[in-house]
Amino acid sequence: MNSLQSLCVLCARLNECALDLECLKFCDPVIVLSDMANFKKNGIVILHLYQTFFEGIKEQNLLCASALTVYMQVLLKAMYEQVLLLDAALESFMVDQDRKKYFEKVLCLKRCAEHLSINISLNNGVEFIVQLSTLNDIEQLISKINSVYALLLPQEGLQICGKIIDLLTIMCGACMVAKPESYLETKTCMKCYEELTLTPNQGKSLRKRLHGKFCNHLTEQKAFFNIEKNIETIEKDLGEAILNYGTIQSVVTEIKKIFKQQRSAESLHVSDAEKTLKKYNIFSKVPDVIYSLSEFTYWSKISETIVRNVAITLQQLNSCHTLYKQLQNDVSLYLYGEVSEDFLALSENLLTHDERLYVGSIYVSPSRLIDLVTGLSIKNLEESPIFKRLAEEDEVQHKIKSLLHDIRDPQTTETPGRLNTINCMLQTHNLQQEVLARKKAYFQKVSESGYNRVMACIREQESLINKVVSVNVYGNFIFEALSKIMNGFVLRKMYLDGSIRVDSCTYDEHLYIKNNLMPKKLPLELLPDLSEIMYTLLTGPLSDFHKSAYPLPANISMAYGCDHAEMLPHMKEDLARCIEGTIHPSVWMVCEYNEFFNFSGVTDVNDMQKKMWNFIRELTLSVALYNDVFGKRLKIVRIDEEEDLNGNVVLTFNHESPLLFHTGGGMTKFKDVYSLLYCDLQAQLSRETVDVPEGVSYSVRTPNLLDLVRENEQDESIIPGCLFDE
């Protein structure tokens, strides 16, 4: 078993322990104190695990984070704090015996720490404050950090990620069951947007398509069914001794009787039709009348879906809750000598039967509540004249009955209700009868259309209730996104130390390359590929769709990141125009000497983004033009990409060392694009060797600024004489 597998096993066991620990918060403290020795023993184990693993996992996340290690950091810290809090609360309860104070302390009811104000500082000192209070806020902040990833210093980025992890520790706690107040189910995340991009938009805007969509990524919905029907399991676990105590056996028997389902009677005409159709299969010779019967039976079943039988009523819900509560009290009397008073029991008397419909019950599965709410809605709809009209015998039922009659008694004359074209043509035209028939058909059409719309609304609300009422656990998307962002900042931080050489190029070298490139033009056919390179360099670590197994173009990755970060449309237009590029260097060669990735004097985030786009454009197009002019194959790579850095221009996004280049003597950092290109050109010249006779010295003349002087300009009237070599 390798280290990762061992960590997964440890995480799984910690999750089991965390769930038990979370349940203890809601239990009667008297029951917890009755087994205090076991609580202390498990608490010591948790403290030992925290002291053994926490610091190591924290350091691991600052070197190479993963979703698992980030989650482990959150889980260990939360369990450690929860054990200390429970221990202190139990010590206080032994003194004052006040359950209300105990639960207020354990559940932190008098204070809310699930809010955080983060001060974000960009490269040039531009600061702004972001308020976080839900998982949606955290996910949105991570998306925005992804959008301005290049403008954040790595130390600042890691510090922000550390604060987010601390907030997740408070918000998630020791248990991964999500608190209802910690997320908004109607607010979507980047994964929701990614899923929508896989289907055609049919001309609808992104906001319209996201409207009404429920996010199942930040919190994942877990369906629980038939919790109330587990009475057989409970009966087996209780044992014979407990079942014979008091009224426990009779209560168990009553619970069994509540949810006995009665099979709803199927429509008689459909049942008869199915019995007839069972005689035929794919090898039988099927008469036309049987085919018609099969088709009408199908449509009849479809139409009957509007009548929905709900297998639970409000009375059954309340009866189930009351009986389970009585069973719990009787078992508590047998085991502990008194009725348990847990957190839920303290507020039990404050709820009416109708209010329990919205609050729910720990003894009834959420799916039952959802069925009940939906059933009450449909029952209210049944009282309307529209539904009553639909419940009447329709033409499909009449057709089925007619066909069955023909099959059973083929000698009988045709049923008057069947369609007979010849008779219709011969019959006298009855205008009044036709009007009534058309009117009935119109009412039927309107009724079905209206009902379908009402049912669609009910289904939509049912989805919302299902998300709200059902158990939700924290998804792994937050931890995955956080680990990707952290790894990007970690790789950038590695090249901030002083061990990297500083370039020794001067302004002359900068000007030499720039003057060589300025008169040239970039080949027009290179622009589309260069645009993709620029999008790749600008895209944050989260928008990595261009690196997936089925990669998308880099501009699509950039579009996803911008859209979810809620970048304004005019900014996206400015980005697109900047990336389009041009073949004329005079347009994009705007960076001064040693001023690459310098944002001094810029006080606005939007202006910083535009300046960053211009920097990346100049870098990309300058390297491409340099390759074209000098016949080189230089490539630009990001520091957070898994590629060979040797011989490539490395973009770090760091203000102090935005560019790196590996030469024979090691890695060198640059603040100027053209000095880096000169360094590459000089390295090529030094690698060129010529066979020289022994005893004869040979050296390659270093390019000089005066090489650009024309022959007719070599006089002191234009070029100062001090620049000429003596």
From Swiss-Prot:
One of its GO terms (biological process) is viral DNA genome packaging. It is found in: Host nucleus. ATP binds at Y626, N627, D628, V629, F630, G631, K632, R633. One of its GO terms (cellular component) is host cell nucleus. InterPro entries: UL28/UL56. Pfam families: PRTP (PF01366). GO terms for molecular function: ATP binding; zinc ion binding. A zinc finger (C3H1-type) spans 189-217. Belongs to the herpesviridae TRM1 protein family. HAMAP family: HSV_TRM1. Component of the molecular motor that translocates viral genomic DNA in empty capsid during DNA packaging. Forms a tripartite terminase complex together with TRM2 and TRM3 in the host cytoplasm. Once the complex reaches the host nucleus, it interacts with the capsid portal vertex. This portal forms a ring in which genomic DNA is translocated into the capsid. TRM1 carries an endonuclease activity that plays an important role for the cleavage of concatemeric viral DNA into unit length genomes. This is Tripartite terminase subunit 1. It comes from Human herpesvirus 6B (strain Z29).
